[in-house]
Amino acid sequence: MVICLSSFPAYACTGITLRTEGGNTVAARTIEWAGSDLESRYVVVPRGYTQRSYVPGGKKDGMLFTSRYGYIGLSVERAEYVVDGMNEKGLSAGLFYFPDCGSYERYDALERDSSVSDLQLVPWILGQCSTVDEVMSAVGRVHVVSADERGSTVHWRFTDNSGRQVVLEIVGGRKMWHENALGVLTNSPDFGWHLKNLNNYANLYPGRASGLEIGGMHLKPFGGGGGLYGIPGDMTPPSRFVRAAFFLSAAPCLSSSEETVMQAFHILNNFDLPIGVQTNMDVAVPDIPSATQWTVACDIGNRRIYYRTMYDSTIRCFDLKATDFVKVKYASHPLDAVKRQPVRFVKVQTD
């Protein structure tokens, strides 16, 4: 199955990036899909593993590629469709939906040996590149085509061990790169538009709003956080981008990577979309517990990937440094062995 967004336009992704006092980078994000269970899996890919890309029409007839580096990623629908992950060199990559704004070049069967599908660009890059510079060079040598021309386009973010992050958008068949010092990414419109839109909120600031004397009255805010009164609270990509940018700007820089990872999960709690709010009133609500199907955080310096899911909010971790990508075999497993939230009972002491 290919995710065809034209048939169910209820999707969203929010990405943030934090840094520790020592300069380590944590790239985190949510993935939302309110249409059905994405049947997500974690995929372990060793060095030397060979894959072939899908091309429009559903055939595995595109570029053949072999991994130079091992990586672990999270996939949707098919194990080949890794949408976020990190490799052993500390390169993180992820795709975000980009509907109605992007447009790839048309697929040419004569160029199939250098054509990679949009939904397989992440695994190809993770297996080939160690730095953002290498990513930009590699992408320039291939044709990125749609896995399913009925579906949405996507855009991508890439973060390397130095902390540098770039966003790739393909518009009119042209590859456009954006440096992302802000560290935020959502969906449409284009990345440049989101940056300009932040100017509409230059009056906002973290903390308590100041009081005001008016007509002999002393006005004061009802509670803390009044400096952000008016920040957009809906679930559209522009509003999520603004909220994420301001939440990041107010977040303290922490000393340890693990604390920073937990901070990323706390920030992304604000983008956990309940099921039903993205579904039209005349459409049946899918039988899943949340539109936010999983949240992942890549601790780049320590080569650790943390995740939780809509079924189990327990945070789990892969340690890439402890993984031998020469000896390990290719593997693909569901993110949740059991699709049910575990509950730990606390025994009340009676004496």
Protein language model regions, located:
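Proteins synthesized as precursors that undergo proteolytic processing into mature forms
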Residues: E111-V145, E149-R150, S257-H266
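Short, surface-exposed beta-strand-loop junctions and turns on beta-sheet-rich folds
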Residues: W33-G35, P99-C101, G173-M176, D312-I315
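Catalytic cofactor-binding cores of redox enzymes
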Residues: R141-K175
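C-terminus-biased signal that marks the final domain/tail of proteins
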Residues: Y11-V26, A34, E39-S40, A147, ...
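N-terminal signal peptide c-region/cleavage motif recognized by signal peptidases
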Residues: S7-P9
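A cross-kingdom feature marking charged/low-complexity
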Residues: E169-N187
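Short hydrophobic/aromatic-rich beta-strand segments that constitute the beta-sheet cores
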Residues: A27, A93-L95, W177, I305-R308
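A contiguous strand-loop segment
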Residues: A12-D113, R150, P334
